[in-house]
Every structure is written in C-alpha cells, then in structure tokens.
C-alpha cells in the first residue's frame, strides 16, 4: 500500500472513530480512549499462527486496521506464533487442528511476513516482529502449572467451539485447553496495550486481558473484526474453499475477482477494504450494482498495485466477460523433456505446469467437470494429450472465466 505521512497528535475522538470503523467487538472503548489520552504510542498486537503461508483479502481486513494504528503513530507488533502453531489453535474448529513443526511454522512465516509488508509500514518505530517461541520455549513445568492455575476449566469450556464439541461428543485434548492461556500469555510477555483479531479470537483475546491483570499489568483493549465472506457469498474467505482473492494476485485477476463479489456483500467489502467515506459508500450502494463493483475493484486494486493500469485491468475483465481471450496472457514454457516418446504430453500435466491446479488428479477432475477450455472451446477429455506441433505453435488454456495460460514448447 502507498506510504503516507504518520499523523501524530490526531484528536483522541477522531482516532476512536477511525479505529472503530468495521469493528465488531471493542472491549472497551473507554479503556482505548484512556490509553490514547496518555499521549504515548500504543503497543498493538496481532498474533498469527503461520499454518498457511498465502494471504488473501480476508487477512487484509485486520492488517488494514493495524495500518490505521500505525498511521496514527502507534506501534504494531506482528507476533508469529511459531510455538503455538506446534499446538494447533482449535478456535472455531469442530475438530483438533493438526500441529506444525517449528521448522514448518518458521518457513511459512517468511512468506507470511513478506505479504504483510504489502500493507504494513516498515519503519522500526511502527513495526516490531516477534516470535512467541522466544518466551514460551523457556517456560518450565512449574511455570506452566502456575499459568494453568490462573484459569478454571469451566471458564475455558465456555468457549463456543468447545461447547459444541462437548455436545457432539467430539474429544477435546488437554493441549487444546491450554491454547487460550498460551496465547493470552503472549500479551503478558509483550505488554500489549491492544490486541486485534477476528471474531473467532474474541475468547482467546479476552483471556489475555484477564491474564495481564493477574500478572499486575494494565489490561489490553480487545478489538475484533468480522471474518470476510468469500466470493461464494456464504463461507468465510479461504484458499481451501477457492472463494478467495490473493494479496499477491495480478491486478487483472484481483479486479476480476472483485467484480464477482455478491451484491449483498458490497457494503461489507467497501467498509473493510477501502477508506471511502460512509456517504460515498451509501451513494454507490443506492446506484447500479455494476458501478459499485467497478468502484470497489478500482479502489482495492489501486491500494495493492499503486502503479497498475486500472483501465487495462478493466478492459481485460470486460473482454473475458464477453467470452473473449485477453492479449497479454503470460506464457508458460513447457520443457521438451515433458513430451513422451510419441511427442505428446497429457493435458492434466499441462494444467499443473500452468499453475491452474496443484496435482494431476485435480487437473483431471477439472477437465472431467468441463471446467477447462482450450482455445476458447470446452476441453472434456481427462486423458487427453497435446502434440509437439500444437505446443510449438502455442495454445491458450483457460480455467473458469478469468484464469488463462499460454503454453509454448521451450526452445
């Protein structure tokens, strides 16, 4: 996102109104106001277990809120839960989440942080990056027992997902009961003034607030934001559900994705992903949905790709929407070594090489379900092959409405 000047000495009430935009829970507004009135930069924490290294616009909702704190002169702490990822956060889950190794968590964190930098300020006074293994690995058994003694099992089991699992007879492991305490202890270690999270993290963040009091600290303010609903209009945005728009998507792909946002979600997307004033949002929502989608797409793409040619992205979207094939499709080189003895290569393998599917099995399923086109025509043979001659000339394959690849034989 484009860097702006840090706005210091903004009136307290103005800061509160800006920071409340899009917020679901604020515990409490009075505490936040009192902390800001002290005139010192707040320490604003966001904890993330790097289980998936690729971020999407759903993650951007909270990262944008962190950026707002930064732009007001506060310091945000990006806490990588490399240690807690080895436990597995059960928040909002109907079953135990498989843990990661420390090595896996730290490898994922590198990609995670690189994408966070698309939104967050990088100045040392605005950003601090920490790993909770710094202090959690140092805790001994006595420390853990002491931490566990500060909360009752009854209070932990008040959490909605645990209640549902108990009712369903689904097992809950002891390590899962410790997770909220472990996450809460992070706030103690960091002396956090504010903690951000999705609505599914409200319970855990309130545990942190309570633990800070137990450890003689001033309790953090807890601020939660909604989980962005994905392009399917029903489930939260998720890569595994393929209803997402990635933070690193090309401008044309991001534009096309935003044009597909279901009409009932436009208000939410405008509020959470843009800085447009409320009056302008209501004006757009009262008009034609296509115009509102266009404004949303241009605003969001401009934020993540300040130098992008928005007119070109829109023109490509319109061309594809009419069934056309764009001119500037990225070329994918097909190594000659992929050809068999007859000079053929399977379409499934080409789909994987183009990055349209992760595996040959997924590619064959895509083809079988008539989700792939070759040269604008539906391609439906999951065992089909292309020839050396076809690839030498170059062919265009298409998944869905807006994912294209031009395949050309290397050399």
From Swiss-Prot:
Protein name: Tyrosine--tRNA ligase
Keyword Ligase: yes
One Gene Ontology CC term in the entry: cytosol
Subunit-level organization: Homodimer.
Any Gene Ontology biological process: tRNA aminoacylation
Reaction(s) catalysed by this chain's protein: tRNA(Tyr) + L-tyrosine + ATP = L-tyrosyl-tRNA(Tyr) + AMP + diphosphate + H(+)
SUPFAM superfamilies associated with the record: Alpha-L RNA-binding motif (SSF55174), Nucleotidylyl transferase (SSF52374)
PROSITE patterns noted in UniProt: S4
UniProt keywords, alphabetically: Aminoacyl-tRNA synthetase, ATP-binding, Cytoplasm, Ligase, Nucleotide-binding, Protein biosynthesis, RNA-binding
Family: Belongs to the class-I aminoacyl-tRNA synthetase family. TyrS type 2 subfamily.
Keyword Aminoacyl-tRNA synthetase assigned: yes
Record EC number: 6.1.1.1
Binding of ATP, residues: 239
Subcellular location, record wording: Cytoplasm
Function statement: Catalyzes the attachment of tyrosine to tRNA(Tyr) in a two-step reaction: tyrosine is first activated by ATP to form Tyr-AMP and then transferred to the acceptor end of tRNA(Tyr).
Native species: Deinococcus radiodurans (strain ATCC 13939 / DSM 20539 / JCM 16871 / CCUG 27074 / LMG 4051 / NBRC 15346 / NCIMB 9279 / VKM B-1422 / R1)
Molecular functions per Gene Ontology: ATP binding; RNA binding; tyrosine-tRNA ligase activity
Motif 'HIGH' region: chain residues: 50-59
NCBIfam families in alphabetical order: tyrS
All residue ranges annotated as the S4 RNA-binding domain in the record: 345-409
Pfam families assigned: SYY_C-terminal, tRNA-synt_1b
InterPro entries noted in UniProt: aa-tRNA-synth_Ic, Rossmann-like_a/b/a_fold, S4_RNA-bd_sf, SYY-like_C, Tyr-tRNA-ligase, Tyr-tRNA-ligase_bac-type, Tyr-tRNA-ligase_bac_2
Motif 'KMSKS' region in this chain: 236-240
């Amino acid at each position: 996102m484009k860097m702006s000047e840090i706005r210091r000495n903004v009136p307290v009430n103005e800061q509160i109104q800006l920071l409340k935009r899009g917020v679901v829970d604020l515990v409490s507004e009075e505490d936040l106001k009192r902390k800001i009135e002290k005139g010192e930069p707040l320490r604003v924490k966001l904890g993330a277990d790097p289980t998936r290294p690729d971020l999407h616009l759903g993650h951007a909702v909270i990262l944008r809120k962190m950026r707002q704190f930064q732009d007001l002169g506060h310091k945000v702490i990006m806490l990588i839960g490399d240690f807690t990822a080895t436990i597995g956060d059960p928040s909002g889950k109907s079953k135990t989440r498989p843990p990661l190794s420390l090595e896996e968590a730290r490898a994922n964190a590198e990609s995670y942080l690189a994408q966070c930098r698309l939104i967050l300020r990088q100045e040392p006074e605005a950003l601090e990056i920490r790993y909770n293994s710094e202090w959690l690995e140092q805790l001994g058994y006595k420390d853990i027992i002491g931490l566990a003694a500060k909360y009752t099992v009854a209070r932990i089991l008040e959490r909605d997902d645990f209640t549902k699992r108990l009712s369903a007879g689904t097992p809950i492991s002891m390590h899962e009961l410790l997770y909220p305490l472990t996450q809460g202890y992070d706030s103690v270690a960091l002396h956090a003034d504010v903690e951000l999270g999705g609505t599914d993290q409200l319970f855990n963040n309130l545990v942190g607030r309570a633990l800070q009091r137990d450890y003689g600290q001033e309790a953090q303010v807890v601020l939660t934001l909604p989980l962005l609903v994905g392009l399917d209009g029903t489930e939260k945005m998720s890569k595994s559900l393929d209803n997402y728009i990635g933070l690193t998507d090309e401008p044309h792909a991001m534009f096309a994705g935003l044009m597909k946002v279901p009409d009932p979600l436009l208000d939410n997307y405008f509020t959470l992903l843009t800085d447009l004033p409320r009056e302008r949002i209501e004006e757009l929502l009262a008009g034609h949905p296509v115009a509102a989608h266009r404004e949303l797409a241009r605003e969001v793409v401009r934020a993540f790709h300040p130098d992008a040619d928005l007119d070109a992205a829109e023109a490509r979207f319109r061309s594809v929407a009419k069934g056309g094939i764009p001119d500037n499709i990225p070329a994918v080189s097909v190594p000659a070594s992929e050809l068999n003895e007859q000079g053929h290569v399977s379409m499934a393998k080409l789909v994987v090489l183009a990055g349209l599917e992760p595996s040959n099995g997924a590619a064959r399923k895509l083809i079988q379900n008539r989700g792939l086109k070759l040269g604008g025509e539906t391609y439906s043979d999951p065992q089909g092959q292309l020839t050396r001659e076809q690839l030498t000339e170059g062919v265009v394959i298409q998944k869905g409405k807006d994912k294209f690849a031009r395949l050309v034989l290397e050399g």
